[in-house]
Amino acid sequence: MMHGTTRQVLSLITNPLDVMCANLQTVRGMMGARPDILGAHLEGPFLALSRKGAHDPECLKDPVPEYVDRLLHAANGCLRQITIAPGIMTHMFNAMNGLHHREPGPIPAAVEDPRVTVELINDGFHVQDPMVRLGFGFAPHRIAFVTDAMAATDCPDGHYLLGALDVNVIDGHARLASNGAIAGSTLTLEKAVQRAVLELGFTPTDAVEAATLIPAKAFGFDRANPVTKQPLGLLASGYAADVLLLNPATWAVEHVWCDAHLLR
């Protein structure tokens, strides 16, 4: 919350199924006392081996009913997103086929469908700036900033774990020690919005929308719901009072309110 994130969906990376089930149960148990936690996102284990990124290949599985049922049972209603969900493209341009004029792949299919929300990691490393601009042009008002942040976020460079995999963080960039694959990020949404406005020249409206209203819409939290009760994503009557006060010059977070409670 020091960086202005008032609500979060916690991403769980591929692990042995028992570990993933235990992690889901932990998230579900935390939600009662932590209104900022909206649920869990499973990034795996149902991934293609050829596009596994920084996931343990030994833990990848086919989405057979037995495995799906175990995860759903463990989640007990807290599961908000799985990366294979057709309505959300997880971090566009990363861990997928790129654009090619004879092999268009998933990106054109996603941007052509107005129902699809497109996630994007705006750290200047996962996706270069010209491609970020291209993404916003392809899918206006459908880009959702995500961090893909791992344990090294807001911490010094060094050695960390991503699940059971060793990760080296150098200059803020996380890579697997074994093969150099990108292993998540150290990005915060504060920095993603700062980059969008100050470095990429996006309007404040577009940058803030990508970190607030668009993600809220993707999960159905832009309207009254059983989890947050009041809708999220706008400064408007009837919405939860999640508010940030930003420095007008640097766009750094100075004060944070969550559900009308001053946190910083």
Language model region names:
Residues 66-157, 263:
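Active-site core of metal-dependent hydrolases
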Residues 1-23, 36-49, 66, 75-90, ...:
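Divalent metal-dependent hydrolysis catalytic cores, especially in the metallo-beta-lactamase
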Residues 21-28, 68-72, 132, 193:
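Generic structural signal for well-ordered alpha-helices
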Residues 259-260:
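Glycine-centered positions in the ABC transporter ATPase nucleotide-binding domain
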Residues 48-70:
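Conserved phosphate-binding/catalytic loop of the ribokinase/pfkB sugar-kinase fold
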Residues 16-18, 49, 55-58, 95-100, ...:
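Short, small-residue-enriched loops and turns at beta-alpha junctions
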Residues 105-120, 135-246:
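His/Asp/Glu-enriched, well-ordered alpha-helical/loop segment
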Residues 20-33, 203-208:
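Short, electropositive alpha-helical surface patch
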